[in-house]
Amino acid sequence: MLNEGLCCGAWAMKGTLLLVSSVGLLLPGVGSCPMKCLCHPSSNSVDCSGQGLSKVPRDLPPWTVTLLLQDNRIHWLPALAFQSVSLLSTLNLSNNSLSNLAAEAFYGLPHLRVLNVTQNSLLSIESSFAHALPGLRELDLSSNSLRILPTSLGKPWENLTVFAVQQNHLLHLDRELLEAMPKVRLVLLKDNPWICDCHLLGLKLWLERFTFQGGETDGAICRLPEPWQGKALLSIPHELYQPCSLPSQDLAPSLVQQPGSAPQDAQKSHENSSGQQDPLECEAKPKPKPTNLRHAVATVVITGVVCGIVCLMMLAAAIYGCTYAAITAQYQGRPLASARKSEKMGSKELMDSSSA
């Protein structure tokens, strides 16, 4: 009997533990919280900021919607780094040591809306980044070491409304990249060493249309060339830009035609401090201004009309002159004929008198 009682008690305890475990799995507020993190089930947020973490914690609660990982030492994000928190909506990775953003690290986050990666050491982002986060609305890449951004994202970033890249090392920004963000309403570009040459004309044209349609931007301030140093890109007239030409095999591709500068007869090669040619500069051959066919046709028509009018006026003047001369001659001829007739009659009378 005693053994049977002990067996029954053991089975009852196991059943209770199993029930408690099942309830713990079903309740979103119950579960493990990563060490050095603060979990707030009421707001579905996990705060792991300022804990000296070198990697993303593994045991994050599946109910996490907001994840704060700023002020750590995270330098690398593995593939599917956040697969355990598929409901994640806001991710803060600012002030870490990230040098690259791999698209694979963000796979499995269809609900991510806000991504903050400011104050890292980012050198570039992958062109497939938009594929990994199609629902992203705010992307902040400020205060990094970005020197170049992808020309194209491969597909439109349909939902992005905020794009911030201020305080980086960007020299140029391709217009095609911004055109892939049809819903963007805020673009932050300040504090980059923008080279306002022919390569930045596309960005200027895009910004003009963007601001005209109600978009907001802090503008791009030129670092080079010297005549435009410190001036806003939008304030430089279009006429000072020369179209960029494709680099020739016989000519060094490191030369640049600066806005407002006269074309050079001989190209001069420029090398950077390492002795290599700078691929960011190119010589733009001046092209003749394209002829406007409509203006040419109008000029020809107007010239023809003017010439026709002049010819008609000359013809009218000639006719008038001839008519006037004929009439004048006719009136002047009558008195002369009468005088001659009178003279003849007088001579005849004189002869008749002499004969008599």
UniProtKB/Swiss-Prot annotation:
The membrane topology term of the UniProt record is: Single-pass type I membrane protein
Transmembrane region(s): 300-320
Domain named LRRCT: residues: 192-246
In which compartments does the protein localize? Membrane
Family annotation (Gene3D superfamilies)? Ribonuclease Inhibitor
Disulfide-bond pairs as recorded: none
Keywords of this protein's UniProt record, alphabetized? Glycoprotein, Leucine-rich repeat, Membrane, Repeat, Signal, Transmembrane, Transmembrane helix
- So which stretches are on the Extracellular side? 33-299
Q: What is its main location?
A: membrane
Q: What is this protein called?
A: Leucine-rich repeat and transmembrane domain-containing protein 1
